[in-house]
């Protein structure tokens, strides 16, 4: 019966061996055991033996023998009994029955794989050289049983081999060893070799020294000594050189053969000298700036005020601030709680004052101020720009108002040419023209708003007709015309109502895809 931990295919080999033994036993039966000499008649029965023996025989008296006679009695008295010779090895008949070759196997057995033996059989070995013996040994190891099955304790069978003295050269010449360094030695620091000296000229003397191979190495007494290879070696006696003292005992060498370490005495100090405090030592250190001094100290020695000089430099180099523009700056404000007043107060006390804030816009002025200086009305310009953004035809009311305004302007020129600019008739005509222009602006804004609100995405085509007439919305015109003034004294123009509400679709033509014709017809119906 094959063992459960046997090799691969062991059960098949055992079964074949049993079949061969059974066939051999059937072909050659075992011979009958030889009969005893004389047959059964040579052994008397119990009764005959008792009668033949007669009565109880008298016991013979023993004979006294010496030790020497006792040892030689058996050899001299009777010849030694020769043990029957046992046949060694197999008989000629058994030798003839042994198989002369492998058993012939059927095709099924040949096709059937036996474990890992057939794995990689069709591959050809690659490479060559020193690695061939390894591959052959590896192939032969496949037939052998596993090491895990042979031994229960692997550490017991581990063999210890001491490391050779010249292991470094052996490794370089013969290639890598089969075992690792962890298997060869238990203490790695025992065979660790010292590194060569960084400055070989500062050793005990001149000469040559080799770390691991042959060469020359000088001893402490002079001459050459071989460390591990060939070379010359001189006794560590005194040297004949003039620089060495004759009869001097050489200094003891360390285990590694390096020069001895120098043990120097501490430096001697004068006991009468007083110790220097640490503060003075720190002061005595050279300054990285040399004899340079701070700028403030240099100016103070010259009798100059560095604060005034900085103020003059700032005035020359700083850009013009917002004081030149029409808008007031918080840094230059005269209010008591403003930052500018605080800065001026600090500067008056003599403390270092903060630098004035520079206007990032420089001399730039607001748009409204620039237009007023040019004699243009920025309100009309803004209304004109807003009106251009609305795509609608000019209404009849707007046309009539524009014609009346143009006629009044012509009359005003004639009156000014006849009566002069300061006449009352000219003032009345100019006031009437300004009123009609305001009325025209209100009408334009109202019609533009209807178009903008009519183009909202959620509104229909007839939403514009639902707005009340213009006469019932005087507050809308006030919201657009009477605008609050800014803090700097310049009027600013707020955003239109539709922009404040977030409706920007009317700025672009056809942005919401609404029909323009339907909106125009609905607005005309509302007029």
Curated annotation (Swiss-Prot):
Record bears the keyword Protein biosynthesis: yes
Compartments reported by the entry: Nucleus
Pfam hit, one: eIF-4B
Secretion signal, residue range per the UniProt entry: none
GO function terms (MF aspect): mRNA binding; protein homodimerization activity; translation initiation factor activity
Function as written in the Swiss-Prot or TrEMBL entry: Promotes the eIF4F and eIF4A RNA-dependent ATP-hydrolysis activity with different efficiency depending on mRNAs, thus providing mRNA discrimination during initiation of translation.
Description of how the protein assembles with itself and partners: Homodimer. Nonspherical monomer. mRNA-discriminating component of initiation complexes.
Domain of life: Eukaryota
Keyword Phosphoprotein in record: yes
Gene Ontology cellular component list: nucleus
Biased composition (Basic and acidic residues): 102-155, 181-194, 293-317, 472-485, 496-510
Chain positions covered by the region annotation Disordered: 1-370, 453-527
Taxon lineage: Eukaryota, Viridiplantae, Streptophyta, Embryophyta, Tracheophyta
Biased composition (Low complexity): 35-45, 74-85, 319-336, 518-527
The protein's name: Eukaryotic translation initiation factor 4B1
Keywords, alphabetical: Initiation factor, Nucleus, Phosphoprotein, Protein biosynthesis
Family of this protein: Belongs to the eIF-4 subunit B family.
Motif (Nuclear localization signal): 196-203
Bias (Gly residues): 203-232
